[in-house]
Amino acid sequence: MPLVSMKEMLIDAKENGYAVGQYNINNLEFTQAILEASQEENAPVILGVSEGAARYMSGFYTIVKMVEGLMHDLNITIPVAIHLDHGSSFEKCKEAIDAGFTSVMIDASHSPFEENVATTKKVVEYAHEKGVSVEAELGTVGGQEDDVVADGIIYADPKECQELVEKTGIDALAPALGSVHGPYKGEPKLGFKEMEEIGLSTGLPLVLHGGTGIPTKDIQKAIPFGTAKINVNTENQIASAKAVRDVLNNDKEVYDPRKYLGPAREAIKETVKGKIKEFGTSNRAK
């Protein structure tokens, strides 16, 4: 099956009361694990790629070809989107699209509102010509993800969200509502009232960044309010790092990378399977 945009995935998720996971890839093993877990659960999946991860893996083109090769060799038949996570500029989004990405996020949330609108609209116009879906952000998601650092959380304004959607034609909206990138310090406090208002006023699938560490009860509460995409990265990184440490701590003679990266891959796979079940994505592939 060829790579697809995430637009139809998210519309179906919103209409049918589940969420599609975006699982960020950092190397070959992450990609194998996420694809295999999704295929075994018959779940559509979004492979997230930050600009930092893209640099680490040599570039957008390399990533697209790696994913396409794995889909062929692993006989992946579920819908798969490759999504640029936190694209920093129109130029970066264009570069990803031209390399074969099927979805992009333009994150101009740090800019003044009118500038955010203008940049986002420019990305949408280019992306939609190529059949590529676009996600945008309003407010500030706290924490750090690669080069994206935010000291605090600034909640999205529901009226600005509606205006951004109307003026740009985006396919999905990531309003900052209390989630953070990386591990949480204490219990997360999501703005469900704002989430419901934004979901109703925009009619768009909403995106929840910083999905690691959000309690299942909050995930289940967010989905009926329009959350159709949930991003996960830290949880997979923690699981894979623990698996590597366990192998190396148990046997100081190990040097073959397959001996420790294999268990890391399995740890990611099991983590993703758990998230797929939690988000209600199992058997939703079409």
Swiss-Prot record:
EC number(s) reported in the record: 4.1.2.13
Active site annotation, chain numbering: 85 (proton donor)
Name of this chain's protein: Fructose-bisphosphate aldolase
Reactions it catalyzes: beta-D-fructose 1,6-bisphosphate = D-glyceraldehyde 3-phosphate + dihydroxyacetone phosphate
Residues the entry annotates as binding Zn(2+) 2: 107, 137
Binding site for D-glyceraldehyde 3-phosphate: 50
Keywords in alphabetical order: Glycolysis, Lyase, Metal-binding, Zinc
Cofactor remark from the record: Binds 2 Zn(2+) ions per subunit. One is catalytic and the other provides a structural contribution.
Biological process according to GO: fructose 1,6-bisphosphate metabolic process; glycolytic process
Residues binding dihydroxyacetone phosphate, per UniProt: 182, 210-212, 231-234
Entry cofactors: Zn(2+)
Positions that bind Zn(2+) 1: 86, 181, 209
Pathway(s) it belongs to: Carbohydrate degradation; glycolysis; D-glyceraldehyde 3-phosphate and glycerone phosphate from D-glucose: step 4/4
Gene Ontology MF terms: fructose-bisphosphate aldolase activity; zinc ion binding
InterPro entries, alphabetized: Aldolase_TIM, Class_II_FBP_aldolase, FBA_II, Fruc_bis_ald_class-2
Described function: Catalyzes the aldol condensation of dihydroxyacetone phosphate (DHAP or glycerone-phosphate) with glyceraldehyde 3-phosphate (G3P) to form fructose 1,6-bisphosphate (FBP) in gluconeogenesis and the reverse reaction in glycolysis.
Family per record: Belongs to the class II fructose-bisphosphate aldolase family.
Pfam families associated with the record: F_bP_aldolase
